[in-house]
Amino acid sequence: MNLLIKNVNLLSMEEDKVLEGVNVYVEGDTIKHIGELLPDVKVDVVIEGKDKLAMPGLINAHTHLGMSLFRNYANDVPLFDWLTKYIWPLEARLTAEDVYWGSLLSMIEMIYSGTTTYCDMYFFMEEVAKATEEIGIRGVISRGIIEEQDAKVNEEKLKDTENLYNAWNGKAEGRIKVMVGPHAPYTCGPTYLKEILDLAKRLGTGIHIHVSETKREVEESLEKYGKTPVQHLKDLGIFEVPTVAAHCVHLTDEDIEVLKEMKVSPVYNPTSNLKLASGFAPVEKMLKKGINVALGTDGPASNNNLNMFEEIHFAATINKALNEDALSVPAFEALKMATVSGARALLWEREIGTIEVGKKADVILIDLNKPHLHPKNDLISALAYSVQGSDVDTVIVNGKVIMEKREIKTVDVERVYYEVEKRAQNLIRGEIS
């Protein structure tokens, strides 16, 4: 199918500039031309871009999609208690079907707010892959690995990851990637982490892991290993493969140098870090070192939504107050975290993250005819400080229109709402879905 987005304002993310009255031609899944109208080119679908802004689809570089089932269940609790007293007991009762429906709900929410690519770590990842294939977005999936006492169980978890990779990596028209997902250095011991690293190297893929999210985690690492989590992971060799390091809140200057040296991509999750009182990641320091900082929501149970425009807004505002510097994390930098840097972190920078000829057509259209977006003085600032997720009008992934005029075309949204409500209540009551 050939598609034309006609007469649109375009922020390609290649430069800090919005172009007016641009035409974007898509052939199949690929952007073929950006610029003037081509009168001799036939297209199947024309999308009118008047009063809209086109930009790359947003990239949520760290989340736990199936946790939408636990949204608004346990709040105002520190991270360790939140996990051990509330979340992990519920997760022990999850079924594959629960995760399928919960993930599908999260994908619906992401589409509605302009996210076209995610990086997810959870359980029953085959179901997440099926939901991704069905709804039409792009995703990096990792089976969350937590070490247990039983060596056989630990071995099975590695085998599960290998099977997931063999079954789904590169599938769904290339929209799915598989990484290896050790939960954290405090839930996986050194020997097990080395086995996980060996698996990632053998598969030729990256690692997605939580790192230095809380002070407690860092203190326990220093007590147990005499090293920070970052230094511990470096010494184990984890950073020898491409690493998506979620959170990176409590870092020393030496840790930041390690992240730079090893080309690790930290993922900043401002709302989750605020809600769980985890602290403030040293984003400005990392950016000044040239580190590739991506942006994420974390899970919908610890945020409690998946609205990446909200994360962009927080990324561009929190750091100004934290550093007492109005120039800290300017609007375009915050937008880069959610597009260009996210693509680089997920090893997809050649395909997505910008709108340019030859890249995949992952494009969102923002409706600019909203009261909070008038007057149109500076659209880049508007995207960081004024746009709401609900302003997203159209979503295109891999050249296919999966939402138009805020109608999702690929799944029965009401059916998903019904299934999630039923399953969430059953889980909380301790019943089997």
Curated annotation (Swiss-Prot):
Q: Which cysteines are joined by disulfide bonds?
A: none
**Which reactions is this enzyme annotated as catalysing?**
S-adenosyl-L-homocysteine + H2O + H(+) = S-inosyl-L-homocysteine + NH4(+); S-methyl-5'-thioadenosine + H2O + H(+) = S-methyl-5'-thioinosine + NH4(+)
Per its record, what are the GO molecular function terms? 5'-methylthioadenosine deaminase activity; metal ion binding; S-adenosylhomocysteine deaminase activity
Residues that bind Zn(2+): H62, H64, H210, D298
Q: Which HAMAP family match?
A: MTA_SAH_deamin (MF_01281)
Q: What is stated as this protein's family in its record?
A: Belongs to the metallo-dependent hydrolases superfamily. MTA/SAH deaminase family.
* Name of the protein this chain belongs to: 5-methylthioadenosine/S-adenosylhomocysteine deaminase
Q: Which organism is it from?
A: Caldanaerobacter subterraneus subsp. tengcongensis (strain DSM 15242 / JCM 11007 / NBRC 100824 / MB4) (Thermoanaerobacter tengcongensis)
